[in-house]
Structure formats: C-alpha cells, structure tokens
C-alpha cells in the first residue's frame, strides 16, 4: 500500500509568492489499484507524483510505502520500486543509445552490471519477445538509435522499460499528452494491459477525461491541493465525462473564471 499522510507542501516559502499547495493532505492507495487523477493546472496532480517519487520533498507529513516512511530515500533509491513514464517521450530513454542498450540498462536497473550482459543471445531473444506484442515493429529494430523512433514508439519503449524489473508502483505523468490521438489510444491500450498483466499499483495523471473514465478502478479530481472527487469500484465505473465537466464548471464559477 502507498500512503500519503498529512502532507504539507509550501512553494517559495518566506516570499511574496509563497503558496501552500498541500495542507494536511492524505491519500491511501491499496496494492493493485489503478488510480486516474484529473484536475486543472496547478491543482497538485504533478506535485503529488513528484512527492511520491522524491523529485521534491514535503514540508510535513509522511509518505509510506508498504508501511515504511520513504521520505529520506533519494529519488534514485525510490526508482528501484517506482517506475515512471513522463509526458515527454524523450524522457525515460537515452536517445543516443540503441533500443538494445536502453533495454539492457533497464533490465539491470539497480544491479552492478555492464552493458555486455545485455548482449547475451538469450537476452536479445527475450527482448524481441517482449517487444513483439507492442505491434510497433521494435523487435526488428534493436540496433536502431532510440532518437530515430517516433514519439509513440519511444513512449511504448519507455513504458516497457519502466516495468521490466519488479516494481511496486507505476507512475504515469500525462504520458499520452504529447502523442497524436491514434498513437495515444495505442499507448493507453498497452498501459492497461501492462498494469493488468503485471498486477501493478498505478497512478495516472491525465487531462484526457475519456481515459480517466475508461481506465482504472478509481478516479480522483484534484483542486488546489484537495481531492474534490474520489470514486472507486462501482462508483467509479458509473462516472461519466459529463459528470467531470460539471464539477470542473462548478469549480471554475467558484474561482470567478
């Protein structure tokens, strides 16, 4: 289980631009749950992910992974148990290295191993079999530089790499936002399959309300550091895009927009 307990986060403390984003914010995510997170810009979505991954530190509260407080763990240490796929397809992979080299690095993440271990014939065959179900032809492009791939191919590779080693949590940070609609649908189908087959606990931040409704078994809507909507199970399955738009409009009116 992942628990964010009584978190407080202040940006630009002691300045005229000081902003308290989270004040006593708590969230518990059981093992195996796939959570979709929506909300307007500045609502706290990405900050929540950054707090979990260790990119930023809280000013109070706890972040517990399987009951252990991980606040003192570096971002690098947390990455052993947390896979993250970013909005930018260029992140999460190395453009100047080949697909094979990227897969090798991901395969031995956290282990004292060099690239030569990834060139073993059995590993190469295994990589091809991992890539084949993607349906993007990557299994025949192992020697190609990642920088030559399309955005969709690169994002699919990043998703695969982030889940190659045993992880506890998968963080999806608007990972389809930079893709065209058709490619985004392909990546979302792949995402759903990977989460389901590997039985991962996943948190997906998205601006695509259709994806938020169609994927996952829990939905959160964030606003100014608070969860203004939290539905799981059958209640989540009953949520429609129109329901989300209604809440967005109500919030907009309250804020004077």
Q: PLM ranges: what are they?
A:
Residues 1, 10-24, 74:
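A short, flexible loop at the N-terminus of ABC-type nucleotide-binding domains that lies
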Residues 53:
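Helix-to-loop junction immediately C-terminal to a conserved catalytic motif
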Residues 206-207:
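H-loop/switch region of ABC-family ATPase nucleotide-binding domains
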Residues 226-250:
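Conserved beta-strand-loop-alpha-helix hinge in the C-terminal portion
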Residues 69-83, 113-116, 120, 236-242:
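ABC ATPase NBD coupling module
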Residues 61-69, 231:
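Conserved ABC transporter NBD signature motif
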Residues 38-40:
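The feature captures the beta-strand-to-loop junction immediately N-terminal to the Walker
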Residues 174-175:
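Walker B catalytic motif
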């Amino acid at each position: 289980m992942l628990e964010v307990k009584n978190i407080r986060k202040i940006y630009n403390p002691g300045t005229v631009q000081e902003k308290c984003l989270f004040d006593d914010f708590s969230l518990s995510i059981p093992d195996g749950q796939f959570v979709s997170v929506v909300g307007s810009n500045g609502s706290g979505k990405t900050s929540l992910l950054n707090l979990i991954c260790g990119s930023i530190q809280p000013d109070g509260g706890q972040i517990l992974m399987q009951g252990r407080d991980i606040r003192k763990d570096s971002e690098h240490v947390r990455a052993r148990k947390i896979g993250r796929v970013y909005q930018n397809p260029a992140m999460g992979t190395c453009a100047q290295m080949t697909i094979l080299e990227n897969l090798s690095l991901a395969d031995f993440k956290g282990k004292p191993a060099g690239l030569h271990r990834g060139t073993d014939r059995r590993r190469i065959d295994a990589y091809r079999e991992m890539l084949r179900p993607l349906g993007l032809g990557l299994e025949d492009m192992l020697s190609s530089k990642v920088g030559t791939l399309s955005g969709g191919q690169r994002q699919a590779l990043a998703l695969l790499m982030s889940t190659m080693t045993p992880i506890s949590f998968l963080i999806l940070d608007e990972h389809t936002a930079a893709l065209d609609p058709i490619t985004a649908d392909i990546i979302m189908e792949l995402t759903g399959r990977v989460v389901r087959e590997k039985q991962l606990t996943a948190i997906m931040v998205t601006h695509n309300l259709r994806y938020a409704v169609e994927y996952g078994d829990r939905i959160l809507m964030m606003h100014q550091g608070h969860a203004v909507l939290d539905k799981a199970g059958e209640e989540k399955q009953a949520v429609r895009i129109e329901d989300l738009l209604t809440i967005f409009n109500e919030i907009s009116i309250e804020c004077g927009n």
